[in-house]
A protein has these predicted regions:
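Hydrophobic faces of well-ordered beta-strands that scaffold small-molecule active sites
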Residues: 63-70, 88-93, 123-129, 176-179, ...
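A charged helix-plus-loop insertion that forms the helical arch/lid used to bind
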Residues: 141-154
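Second-shell residues forming the walls of enzyme active-site clefts
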Residues: 57, 100-116, 194, 198-360, ...
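Sec-dependent N-terminal signal peptides of Gram-positive bacterial secreted proteins and lipoproteins
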Residues: 1-26
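N-terminal hydrophobic targeting/anchoring segments and the immediately downstream early-domain regions
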Residues: 21-122, 129-135
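Active-site beta-loop-alpha junctions enriched in small/polar residues
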Residues: 71-73, 96, 130-132, 181-183, ...
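Short, acidic/polar
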Residues: 71-85, 157-168, 248-256, 319-327
Length: 382
């Protein structure tokens, strides 16, 4: 099935990119602009990013917007094909990819080698390792209690444990952990508290500890999913509360964390919940009112915005993957997580490429996201 879709995709890509060009046989070929050379140059970080983006193809730019899951515990041919053909910016691993520490180290090493061979910019290698109910390879990695349980102890204890986890994950080859959870009162003990100030104290300390261990991290799930009444993995949840209520409760956590956290050390993950009094037509991850107008303009967040997994029922039951990808980037997201099905990843990529080619996503909009992503990658020496 994958090969048939791939064949169709390649034909479509050729149709999109074909054209005529005239070449001067006496013209001196410009030296290729490599990521490594630019990073090691004396330019400022912003100048480095501008130079890289100016020399990237649309295909490479669009690939940066995707962080995908792969299948298997080794880097098989299908996974290599996804890296080569879709130029992705990152990989996220799950239990299905993880059997032992040595196996995970080998897999991540092979992923990075394949990315380098394909000429990709260095990859985000991610994991969900919150602790409690959301933990990978539990029997072989440091065991972390649920956030609710951790919050019964000291902030220092939570931070020290997070630093140990970060060091362990970094040693395996990961460079971003999609944690801590910054929501209020989630089920399964995933939240530190129902009190915003308490969540800020714990989530902020845990995030800082991840940074000190050499990992990027992610506050999630903006603007807060503690008031949802449907599991977003299954379907949409409509939350009929006002922006003022959210700013006093769930979203206050994010406002405070943005103020105290070091730029380019973290992402903000946006949820798929719908907040009907703010945007009655779109879930948060597809909402310009929530991402661009509220998070970026009103709250002043200039860093990377990543979506929750787009394979979740809250989106997948209601949109095609091409449409949801385009709408999310238009809304202000930078990275789309598509974690489980290669076909869905391909549909998202093809939808984005088409939107870039026909101007639905402008060059300026595309470049803005790619610049944020590359600036973040450079911040930890990728």
């Amino acid at each position: 099935m994958l090969r048939r879709i791939v064949a169709a995709t390649m034909i479509g890509a050729l149709a999109l990119t074909s054209g005529c060009a005239f070449h001067n046989p006496f013209a001196k070929k410009a030296e290729p602009v490599t990521y490594e050379a630019v990073v090691q140059s004396e330019l400022s970080p912003e100048e480095k990013v501008d130079k890289l983006v100016a020399n990237m193809s649309d295909a490479d730019k669009v690939g940066q917007l995707l962080m995908i899951g792969i299948h298997g515990t080794t880097l098989n041919d299908d996974a290599k094909f996804m890296l080569n053909e879709y130029r992705v910016g990152g990989i996220i691993l799950f239990d299905r990819n993880m059997e032992s520490k040595e196996q995970v180290k080998t897999l991540i090493t092979d992923i990075n080698k394949a990315g380098k061979s394909a000429g990709l910019t260095p990859l985000f290698i991610g994991i969900d390792q919150e602790g409690g109910a959301v933990a990978r390879m539990e029997d072989k990695l440091i065991k972390v209690p649920p956030a609710e349980e951790l919050s019964q102890g000291s902030v220092d204890h939570a931070a020290n444990l997070a630093k140990q986890v970060g060091t362990e994950l970094k040693d395996l080859g990961f460079n971003i952990n999609f944690a801590p959870d910054a929501d209020l009162g989630l089920t399964y003990g995933r939240s530190y508290s129902t009190n915003p100030d308490q969540v800020v104290k714990f989530a902020g300390a845990v995030g800082k500890a991840y940074d000190e261990s050499g990992l990027w991290y992610s506050y999630k799930h903006f603007p807060g999913i503690g008031k949802t009444d449907v599991d977003l993995h299954a379907d949409t949840s409509v939350v009929p509360v006002s922006k003022d209520t959210l700013l006093a409760e769930d979203t206050k956590v994010f406002v405070d964390l943005i103020k105290q956290s070091k730029p380019n050390t973290y992402m903000i993950m946006v949820s798929h919940a719908m907040y009907s009094q703010i945007d009655p037509d779109h879930p948060s991850s597809l909402s310009k009112k929530i991402i661009t107008d509220w998070l970026r303009k009103d709250m002043g967040y200039n860093g990377v915005v990543v979506t929750d997994d787009m394979d979740m029922g809250a989106l997948a039951k209601h949109y095609t993957f091409g449409d949801m990808a385009v709408q999310s980037i238009q809304a202000g997201s930078d990275i789309l997580l598509v974690c489980h099905e290669y076909e869905h990843m391909q549909e998202a990529y093809n939808g984005l490429m088409k939107a870039v080619k026909d101007g639905t996503i402008s060059k300026e909009r595309l470049d803005a996201s790619v610049k944020r992503i590359l600036l973040m990658k450079m911040s930890h020496g990728l």
